[in-house]
């Protein structure tokens, strides 16, 4: 029997993310941000230059998604996750400055996992191939930075019960590695 999903609402605190463990089913509601590799590169460059970011990272969640155009009556087009390793070069710097969660698909680098452990952040997986269903969880979307990047612009999303699973927790655990162990032949 599966337990009820855990409900969270950003901004998240250290205490919020410390409660989460790999395999937890989570429903996220409230405000999150979108960003992919081109936007991450720009955020990283701003940090290197000592400049302010276009939004406050503290306690926030970034969803690695590039939406398709929204259909009439929808706030957002398809909202399927992007492969996360493309953000790995930039993520440790963002985590160090207060980012508490990332949503994507696929494994993360050791450097990202170490940053999550050190600065208390988590990585969630959203279901790949379910972009149309995930889009229904987006109630409002607005571009807040880098409009010139088109689908890769940073958007502020208002979401309601976006379903995700904890893949990496603050203790350094990795659901992909632990899951594989169950089925490995010794």
Descriptions of predicted regions:
Residues 91, 166-186:
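Active-site/ligand-binding-proximal alpha/beta "capping" segment
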Residues 13, 33, 68-70, 171-173:
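Short, glycine-/Ser/Thr-/acidic-enriched flexible segments
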């Amino acid at each position: 029997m599966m337990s009820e999903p855990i409900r969270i609402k950003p901004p998240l605190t250290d205490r919020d993310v410390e409660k989460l463990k790999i395999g937890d089913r989570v429903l996220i509601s409230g405000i999150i941000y979108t960003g992919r590799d081109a936007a991450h590169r720009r955020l990283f460059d701003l940090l290197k230059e000592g400049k302010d970011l276009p939004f406050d990272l503290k306690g926030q969640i970034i969803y690695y998604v590039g939406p398709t155009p929204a259909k009439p009556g929808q706030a957002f087009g398809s909202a399927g996750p992007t492969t996360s390793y493309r953000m790995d070069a930039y993520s440790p710097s963002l985590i160090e400055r207060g980012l508490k969660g990332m949503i994507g698909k696929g494994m993360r680098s050791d450097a990202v996992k170490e940053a999550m452990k050190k600065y208390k952040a988590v990585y969630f997986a959203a279901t790949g191939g379910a972009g149309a269903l995930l889009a229904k969880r987006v109630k409002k979307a607005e571009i807040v930075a880098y409009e010139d990047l088109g689908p890769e612009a940073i958007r502020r999303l208002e979401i309601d019960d976006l379903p995700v699973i904890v893949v990496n927790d603050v203790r350094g655990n990795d659901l992909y590695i632990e899951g594989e162990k169950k089925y490995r032949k010794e």
